[in-house]
């Protein structure tokens, strides 16, 4: 029987093969199918959002299966509320990595206390989650009464939170210059629509987080090199995560033709499928920084499922118990 590590690695390869298939079809996160995943995957019972590779994995499953509900939870979590998985449905594996542990030590006074120590080798486990549409009679998704943001206002706000200057100029390229720490974009009128401008803006802002005084990623290699492709992949996924947190639809198009990028990404992750998950981890850091800067000045739109899920177990218990009357006391 395979252990947790082998199972997780097998599932990683399966996902990356699917992503590569999408790339070979000529798209990655900018087709209408991906717009289903504009609301990031969230757990309605624990009230948390899935992060990193788990976030991307569940977004990909929304696209693959055509789900319109962004909510995911384990079978046990559903059953604790009295809901059960439909017959024949299969869950999606999510990973949990542990990099540190609490070690019992004694302080200078001889009293026992705990300190955090790094593990020599990370420990991995996994769990499986199911989309709410796979659950019998689960309350339908309300959409959180979410309204699409005013993109003109949102774009201006995003730009105002940038850690480096952003220049909009009548020219043909969108790029971040590490040496000058400046982002240059074409004019907004040169884009297909505002969503496409926002998507390109966040991609370049994602690159800017790699500066030495920020997240300190290496900008290595010319266009077409492996180092260049790795950084582009991180910026693309980082922008994707940020778009979902800001409520921006994912169906926008980049200003430039990304077919060359797609080919370079295929080469990187085909040779090492774990590189895709390393990119997702870095992308989460990118998004956390961009969103952190944004929330210093503005509030995020309400994207988490705010409604409380009815507990059917307690409802059934109340129904089963006879009403207590004065005569029965």
Where are these regions (language model features)?
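N-terminal accessory/interface modules of nucleic-acid-binding and processing proteins
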Residues: 1-328
